[in-house]
Amino acid sequence: MKEHSIDIQLSHPDDLFHLFGSNERHLRLMEEELDVVIHARTEIVQVLGEEAACEEARQVIQALMVLVNRGMTVGTPDVVTAISMVKNDEIDKFVALYEEEIIKDNTGKPIRVKTLGQKLYVDSVKQHDVTFGIGPAGTGKTFLAVTLAVTALKRGQVKRIILTRPAVEAGESLGFLPGDLKEKVDPYLRPVYDALYQILGKDQTTRLMEREIIEIAPLAYMRGRTLEDAFVILDEAQNTTIMQMKMFLTRLGFNSKMIVNGDISQIDLPRNVKSGLIDAQEKLKNIHQIDFVHFSAKDVVRHPVVAQIIRAYEPAPVKNEEREEVQEEIE
């Protein structure tokens, strides 16, 4: 097939650095993911390759240049998102992701959605009392949930944040680990702590936890409570039983929001126990103030190979097939 060539005119020589990053790491990423060769010289970017691939590269570069011209810093996640969107014929929606800033992190860096799935998730949380975020790791579910909770707290929309998860892990018997239940579960809540530290900083997070404005606790600690004026997040919800999920959801009080996050491809419950997350999808789908947002490999904002790994496991994971047979027997 004949090699195609496209020249893209930039506004300023400095645009090359802002667009392609230090050591041209973004340029190499585009070349690898789009199967093109890119030559960057002063204010001209030349793209070589098959015509369709060159056109995709042109669209990615022009979309990223909109951010550069607005004075935004283009990072690797932005390039990954643009590449993913052009491959899914969604590049025309790329710039819209950057129109709204959710909040600034501890260093003053704006936090925005990175994919269309994330935007749908954020909009759903704003519009519903209970939002389920279901999808693979790397799609930003936990980080976005914590971001939205902190935003609501800072705006005075809620008085506290409660973060919880079930105490079930594959290959770990918590009963044989030292410490009480909270101490046993804390290491598994690391992604939640990481998100809080990035958004609030470690010192402020610690102060808010000491004042019990932020509470991080195992799911078992939710029993018997009514959670009012609170933003409540349940992570790793695929590992709840049906009764645990019912118990959690019925804790919802007035002026509260709930987010339930999980990945139904990573269930660690015993084979004969049905996941409360799967059950909730079936039973609650027609309730007006409850919404389900499904993420896919398209929403992965980690290294591009992670999305490829997720896709490789999506068609027919053995674990899921076995589980579906068991679920049918249970029902």
Please report, for each region that a protein language model flagged, where it lies by residue.
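Short glycine-/aliphatic-rich beta-strand segments at the starts of folded cytosolic domains
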Residues: 1-18
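Short, surface-exposed acidic/glycine-rich loop or hinge patches that mediate macromolecular interfaces
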Residues: 13, 24, 51-52, 239, ...
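Short amphipathic alpha-helix segments
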Residues: 15-32
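Hydrophobic side chains in well-ordered alpha-helices
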Residues: 19, 57-60, 245
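Compact, well-ordered interaction domains used in eukaryotic information-processing assemblies
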Residues: 28-29, 34-37, 43
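Interdomain "pre-motor" coupling segment immediately N-terminal to P-loop NTPase/helicase cores
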Residues: 39-98
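Conserved helicase motor core of SF1/SF2 NTP-dependent helicases
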Residues: 44, 106-234, 238-331
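Conserved loop-to-helix interface motifs that mediate assembly, gating, or partner/ligand docking
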Residues: 87-109, 113-116
